[in-house]
């Protein structure tokens, strides 16, 4: 508990605590009991919003609702308030003559932020607002702190992230964004389940980081006296399940990478990985396009997705281009030609492309060219395929040109949204690539991984040809909610 709770109470907090004590003295539990509602605000509006004042009087419908008091006005013998539940707000009208004296005292002394239950008649005011004319009030919970910014929501960005509960109470746009996030994840599940995929769970604690190029968080298991890492990907465990015969699997879960934070990166994030036996990267391109298009249709409809003023043709076939061709389009440099590492380094110097100390292969320079010149041009959904072997340690080599792999990444609005490939199922080749990664790690590449011998052993039992995919859920949520920072789609982002 923070020291904030032990600081001197302000006047409002003192008054609210006095009201809490007064409720208890009247035999009313300040923090309430179970309460059964007959409807929420959205259901009432759907049922009665289009009815006239006279129609509602004739119908004589009653309802029982509950929620948080967000506004309150009126003095003397009558008053109005807006009650907020998960679906929105609805107005209540309370008149002293229509409720018990105790009930009216509850209403009079209620503060903004308190929870109440209301039973009454559904009606419309003279200005046409759907409301509940209260016949009975039930106190449900006392708010001991006042809500921020009564009418304008919570505007302080830092507080919105640190105290997400206040953001959700006061900013409906933020609340709805997280409802949409939940729907996005549900629709991805629905799509994959419909294709016969099994959702599975794999360990978060790993003995060896693997499945991605990233720096892990390291922890220690006291009972076993061993260092472990939080997973940087779910890939290697999911492929063990393909070895085990599950054929079509996916996992939606948290991934942890001990790296920098910016508008699109958080150390803890959500990804989905999908693996399909007897498939290749082209099948997985089709699957990826299907997942994205199905989810977009469910969330935003059949039209284009608008992101920061740019229309994304999400329902059109996605463009497909080889990485080497994309580089050639932007720079004129042709990496289809065979060349030495020194020749590639000279091209990099000529085009001001950075070459890292641990770069020892042409493929790494090709990838740097792509990042430097191509990524920023990819606005509409584009599959870039054919990544070099040097930057794709888990992908199968291309049959026609073994310098490259059967791998692709999906780019939208210059950002990577998915990474996929025909999986490497040759244990001898895989071991050689793991060993090359381990060497890069020794040379200072802190994103390179070591050798996972247990995974090699699993491959030695035989894995069928397989296609695999990873999609960043948070970035997809940003795209489909037109949000510019990952913190606005994470309920509790990492804070300093």
UniProtKB/Swiss-Prot annotation:
| Manner of cofactor binding, per the entry note | Binds 3 Mg(2+) ions per subunit.
The protein's name is: Lysine--tRNA ligase
**Which biological process terms from the Gene Ontology are attached to this UniProt entry?**
lysyl-tRNA aminoacylation
Give binding positions for Mg(2+) 1.
409, 416
Q: Which residues bind Mg(2+) 2?
A: 416
GO MF terms, alphabetically ordered:
ATP binding; catalytic activity, acting on a protein; lysine-tRNA ligase activity; magnesium ion binding; transferase activity; tRNA binding
Q: Which UniProt keywords apply?
A: Aminoacyl-tRNA synthetase, ATP-binding, Cytoplasm, Ligase, Magnesium, Metal-binding, Nucleotide-binding, Protein biosynthesis
Which cell locations does it reside in? Cytoplasm
Q: Which domain of life is it from?
A: Bacteria
What do the Gene Ontology cellular component annotations say? cytosol
Q: Indicate the family of this protein.
A: Belongs to the class-II aminoacyl-tRNA synthetase family.
Q: What is its main location?
A: cytoplasm
**So what does this thing catalyse?**
tRNA(Lys) + L-lysine + ATP = L-lysyl-tRNA(Lys) + AMP + diphosphate
- Annotated Pfam families: tRNA-synt_2, tRNA_anti-codon
PROSITE patterns under this entry?
Answer: AA_TRNA_LIGASE_II (PS50862)
> Gene3D superfamilies from the entry?
Bira Bifunctional Protein, Domain 2 (3.30.930.10), Nucleic acid-binding proteins (2.40.50.140)
| Cofactor(s) required, per the database record | Mg(2+)
E.C. code: 6.1.1.6
Q: Which organism is it from?
A: Streptococcus suis (strain 05ZYH33)
Query: Assembly and interactions?
Result: Homodimer.
């Amino acid at each position: 508990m923070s020291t904030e709770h032990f600081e001197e109470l302000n006047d409002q907090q003192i008054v609210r605590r006095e009201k809490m004590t007064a409720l208890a003295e009247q035999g009313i539990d300040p923090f309430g009991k179970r309460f059964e509602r007959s409807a929420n605000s959205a259901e009432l509006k759907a049922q009665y919003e289009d009815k006239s004042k006279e129609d509602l009087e004739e119908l004589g419908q009653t309802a029982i609702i509950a929620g948080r008091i967000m506004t309150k006005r009126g003095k003397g013998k009558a008053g109005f308030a807006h009650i907020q539940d998960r679906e929105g707000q609805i107005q209540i009208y309370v008149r002293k003559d229509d409720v018990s004296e105790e009930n009216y005292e509850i209403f009079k002394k209620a503060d903004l932020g308190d929870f109440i239950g209301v039973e009454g008649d559904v009606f419309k005011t003279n200005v046409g607002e759907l409301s509940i004319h209260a016949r009975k009030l039930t106190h449900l919970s006392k708010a001991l702190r006042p809500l921020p910014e009564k009418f304008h929501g919570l505007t302080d960005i830092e507080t919105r992230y640190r105290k997400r509960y206040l953001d959700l109470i006061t900013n409906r746009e933020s609340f709805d964004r997280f409802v949409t996030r939940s729907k996005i994840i549900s629709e991805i599940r629905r799509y994959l389940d419909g294709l016969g995929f099994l959702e599975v769970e794999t360990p978060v604690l790993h003995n060896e980081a693997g499945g991605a190029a990233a720096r892990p968080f390291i922890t220690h298991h006291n009972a076993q006296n061993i260092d472990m890492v939080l997973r940087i990907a779910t890939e290697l465990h999911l492929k063990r399940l393909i070895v085990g015969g599950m054929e079509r699997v996916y996992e939606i879960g948290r991934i942890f990478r001990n790296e920098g934070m910016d508008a699109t990166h958080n150390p803890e994030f959500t990804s989905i990985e999908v693996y399909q036996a007897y498939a290749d990267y082209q099948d997985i391109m089709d699957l990826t396009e299907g997942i994205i298009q199905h989810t977009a249709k469910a969330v935003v409809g059949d039209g284009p997705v608008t992101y920061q003023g740019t229309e994304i043709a999400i329902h059109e076939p996605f463009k497909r281009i080889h990485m080497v061709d994309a580089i050639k389009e932007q720079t004129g440099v042709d990496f289809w030609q065979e060349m030495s590492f020194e020749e590639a380094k000279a091209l990099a110097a000529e085009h001001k492309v950075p070459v890292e100390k641990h770069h020892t292969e042409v493929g790494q320079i090709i990838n740097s060219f792509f990042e430097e010149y191509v990524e920023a041009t990819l606005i509409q959904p584009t599959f870039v395929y054919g990544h070099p072997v040097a930057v794709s340690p888990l992908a199968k080599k291309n049959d026609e040109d073994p310098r490259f792999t059967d791998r692709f990444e999906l780019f939208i609005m210059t950002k990577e949204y998915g990474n996929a490939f025909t999986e490497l199922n040759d244990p001898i080749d895989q071991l050689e690539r793991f060993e090359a990664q381990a060497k890069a790690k020794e040379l200072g590449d802190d994103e390179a991984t070591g050798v996972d011998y247990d995974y090699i052993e699993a491959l030695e039992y035989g894995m069928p040809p397989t296609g695999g995919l990873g999609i960043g859920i948070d970035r997809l949520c940003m795209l489909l909610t037109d949000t510019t920072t990952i913190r606005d789609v994470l309920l509790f982002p990492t804070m300093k």
